[in-house]
Amino acid sequence: MSLSQPLFIKLLLKHWKIHNIPVSAGYLTYSTTLAIVPLVMVVFSIFTAFPIFQEATEQLKTLIYDNFAPNAGDMVEEYIDLFVANSKKMGIVSTIGLVVVALMLIQSIDETLNKMWRNHRKRSIFISFLLYAVILFIAPLLAGGSIAISSYIFSMAIFNENGLLSFSQQLLQYTPFLLIWLLFTTVYWLVPNTKVNILHAMLGAIVAAIFFTLGKQAFVWYISTFPSYQAIYGALAVLPIMLLWIHLSWQVVLFGGLITSTLNVYNEMKKGKLNL
């Protein structure tokens, strides 16, 4: 796929301004802040229902907290574990309320991404609920299953012989990146209520995954090198760190979606079906 870079970049910048990505990321940051505890509660409740994922659960926790709040993962994990423990004491009505809040976050993501495709068609309530439920309940199982399978495979005797141990460890280092790429690809491909070219989704996802990974490293470096926020916020320093990282993460996610949708517009323009 050859791209006329000036035209493609011009389209990308135009759509960035039209969709006001920083503002959209701020909206999703607010939604995430409200939904993070219900979302984590639902995810790990699913894991506890499947004993086979017991070992994978701890690895997935580490993966989530390291990417969710780099350089503050331990403190965030402590608070969220406390909130989740308290949520287990709630009744059925309150639990249903938490699930609804988690589904509302997924709905916010759905609406934001569909705006990028200028898609005004609405899914039926049943289809929307089914899609959100699949994302909420099936995605954690797929993530846990992939981690459990990879851990099992690389713990086999063959990887402990002939110097393959270091090879398996190197492969496992790329597991988080591959999972993020797969997650982004799935979101860009399935969430928009229109036909999306899988190659476009994969390309947008790989760019987003690279920016996400590099951004996390840069964020950790900045926080470690310039810790002035700790002197200002003290014990509450984890809050602005978490909010800032969530906002940056959503900008990366939306940027990947923007690339995916812009590729579609670019191809339509090449075919003469659209004008700039």
Curated annotation (Swiss-Prot):
The transmembrane segments are 33-53, 90-110, 125-145, 147-167, 171-191, 203-223, 239-259
> Quick check: keyword Endoplasmic reticulum in the entry?
no
In terms of Pfam families, this protein maps to: Virul_fac_BrkB (PF03631)
| Compartments in which it is found | Cell inner membrane
Q: Which residues form a coiled coil?
A: none
Alphabetic keyword roster: Cell inner membrane, Cell membrane, Membrane, Transmembrane, Transmembrane helix
Q: How does it sit in the membrane?
A: Multi-pass membrane protein
Q: Which GO terms describe its cellular component?
A: plasma membrane
Q: Does the keyword Repeat apply?
A: no
Q: Kindly report the protein's main subcellular placement as a broad class.
A: membrane
* HAMAP family according to UniProt: UPF0761
Hey, which family's this protein in? Belongs to the UPF0761 family.
Name-wise, this protein is UPF0761 membrane protein APL_1950
Organism of origin is Actinobacillus pleuropneumoniae serotype 5b (strain L20)
